[in-house]
Amino acid sequence: MGTHASPNVLLVVLDSVRAANCSLYDAARETTPYLSRLADESTVYTQARAPSNWSLPSHVSLFTGLDAHVHQVTVHDRLRAGHTVFEALAADGYATGLFSENGFLTGRDAGLADPFETVVGVPDDYDDRYDTTVLDPGPDGFYYADRVLAWSAEVDGPWAACLNLMDAHRPFEPREAYDRWGDDRARTIQADLPIRWEWAFYGGDRPYWQLGALESLYDGGIRQADAVLEHVLESLRSRGALDETLVVVCGDHGDGFGEPGRVPGEPPAVSHILPMHEELLHVPLVVRPPGGATGERVDELAALTRFPAVARAHARGDPPSRGFTVDRALALKQPVTADLRERFERRCDPVEPYLEPSRAVYENAPDTSGAVRKHSYWGDTGVTTLVHAPGVVEHREPIEPETVDRAFRDGNDRDGGDDRDPVREPLAGRQPDADVEAQLAALGYY
């Protein structure tokens, strides 16, 4: 199994989905029944880590295989051509497609859409059956699922696609069939909040307990994303294409609902972009190779940055023995700059705890079965923790931030250092499209 030459490649990104809230990883709510069934014919990674705590840097890392501190792409930059796995696959004869509501992928001039021949973002008009939200002006994930299915059915030859599903991204508006844990109070709390709600909590306007109500809606969003995934994969199965496809399902980052910091001075986790908690970095990762697998669960450390190497190896018909496992994984929080920094300065007093730099290094813990070590810092304070499972974290000992920074320097040198071809280029004053910015604002990015 898994040795087909030139299989299709399907990367399904469950945007904002954290491992701790997936029933696949023993979450109390049955949020991922299909993913749990898919696990029986796949490889499940129990200790997978995202390279950053929000979509833009994580997707650049997913597409290029470069850690976030290496590519350094922020909202002020764009990814230069020639660095992604999808361009490499296109050169090998693959048709390529990108399907997502996330404007950082399909709308904004970030360079992430450029590698793809077909790009489907938020449409001007769409069928009412996809119009299931009030706060979010775009269609739900079933729209993008149907677009990737229609596109792949017309491709003559191998194809490679990224389907990014935003059903579990704020605002949380799952269809009634999947909204199993939310209630009127939760929906009212969300409706009364600004869509970018970090400052309502960090600034003291709202109590942190209200985030628990939002989490009940978030879990419904995960359940809906799971149903969209089922629709896509079972449709491929019914047409005989699933066994000809490498399927990689992952979260690009998680989300925060008031979890306390584990480093002294670290604020509670609220949403994403700022927090570096495990709830933001520990993500689901399920890989179904062509022909299926045997339901193996891998407890070693795994990194999303392995996707390009894994995809290219499968395309050659030579799957890598290590899969997504790594000896070390790196994750970072990008600097809080420009408008985002100004908003924190206006709403938070003191503001300094929210602006601190943060990095994390993960390593396997061979002396503790199934666990990984996390060395991280927030500002000038660092700690080592032992992560046994999603949401199960044991504090170990304080460390110096330099211990973490040294690992990042080693990683940069390993990836070519200053001699490496530039991956990014500045936007240099180019103004974003107003419609794209409005759509991103509706998703809580501004």
Region annotations inferred by a language model:
Residues 1-446:
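Catalytic domains that recognize anionic headgroups
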